[in-house]
Amino acid sequence: MRVIFAGTPEFARVALERLLAAGFTVPLVLTQPDRPAGRGMKLQASPVKQCALEHGIAVAQPRSLRLDGKYPEEAAAARAAIEAAQADVMVVAAYGLILPQWVLDTPPRGCLNIHASLLPRWRGAAPIHRAIEAGDAETGVTIMQMDAGLDTGDMCLVERLPITADDTTASLHDKLADLGGRLIVEALEMSACGGLPRTPQPAEGVNYAHKIEKAESQIDWRQDAEAIARRLRAFNPFPGGATQYGDESIKVWEAHADPAIAVGTAAPGTVLSAGADGVRVACGNGVLCMTLLQRAGGKRLAAGDFLRGFDLPEGAVLDGAASGGTP
């Protein structure tokens, strides 16, 4: 079976590697254009492009696939490449571009998407983050037959995965990437034998995983400690949690709710204690114990090491609404 692959980040690279290892022919890869990255802001190829080049696969990087859009020449060139590839199916994983109808219609077996949620829950751009943030007990991967809607196509394969109490977006991403790679191989093998099932998504339980914005990193100490801890796990590795003490900006990377400590009459954001085992802060309900922190321009440090270079006394008040420098 000939497979065009469309994807960009590490999540997609894992799937591409699994397809190649399973023996599928991939004549063409579509991925986002190279972007400036790193301290030097040099152009950097996506993980999928790097993988494709390592395997000698042709790469197309159009800025748009809309023939009537802003970049019609790039879209037309991509169309020619897609048609010339004579693929049976296209596999899409975190590509980052909307696929026009002509793309969906070109491969005889259509386009299969690897989506990191249990559809129809968490359609959209950030399903892993939002599942953790919401406190979901489980998530999973859905292999979907794409249509013109936003993650609205028929479900072909679904597999569930528990979300553990210490999962971050980083750790859950890796588990789901591995699961997605395995499931898409299964789906294509079933399709080759003519037996890939399709089930319409239920109308109930639809919600959307909106893109993560950097401004969401600001900690609101009026919230429940458990909710803040979930957000910090959801926003690790990006954008982290942010708070302010005086003129200093602090990033928070790891924390947990501490039910053993009473808030008393302390206002939300008040430091209750600060030691090697963590910085405990009063929240709207409960106490948050911060264990991995970072000051502007510094490294991520365990609480004890952080406090050796940063005075954060008991009774200090952190401001989750303030904005300061970005570490």
Swiss-Prot record:
Keywords recorded for this protein, A-Z: Protein biosynthesis, Transferase
EC number(s) recorded for this UniProt protein: 2.1.2.9
Keyword Ion transport recorded: no
GO cellular component, one term: cytosol
SUPFAM superfamilies from the UniProt entry: FMT C-terminal domain-like, Formyltransferase
CDD domains: FMT_core_Met-tRNA-FMT_N, Met_tRNA_FMT_C
Source superkingdom: Bacteria
UniProt-listed InterPro entries: Fmt, Formyl_trans_C, Formyl_transf_N, Formyl_transf_N_sf, Formyl_transferase-like_C_sf, Met-tRNA-FMT_C, Met-tRNA-FMT_N
UniProt GO molecular function: methionyl-tRNA formyltransferase activity
Main enzyme class: transferase
Residues binding (6S)-5,6,7,8-tetrahydrofolate: 117-120
Entry-linked Pfam families: Formyl_trans_C, Formyl_trans_N
Catalytic function, reaction form: L-methionyl-tRNA(fMet) + (6R)-10-formyltetrahydrofolate = N-formyl-L-methionyl-tRNA(fMet) + (6S)-5,6,7,8-tetrahydrofolate + H(+)
Record-stated family: Belongs to the Fmt family.
Primary role: Attaches a formyl group to the free amino group of methionyl-tRNA(fMet). The formyl group appears to play a dual role in the initiator identity of N-formylmethionyl-tRNA by promoting its recognition by IF2 and preventing the misappropriation of this tRNA by the elongation apparatus.
The protein, known as: Methionyl-tRNA formyltransferase
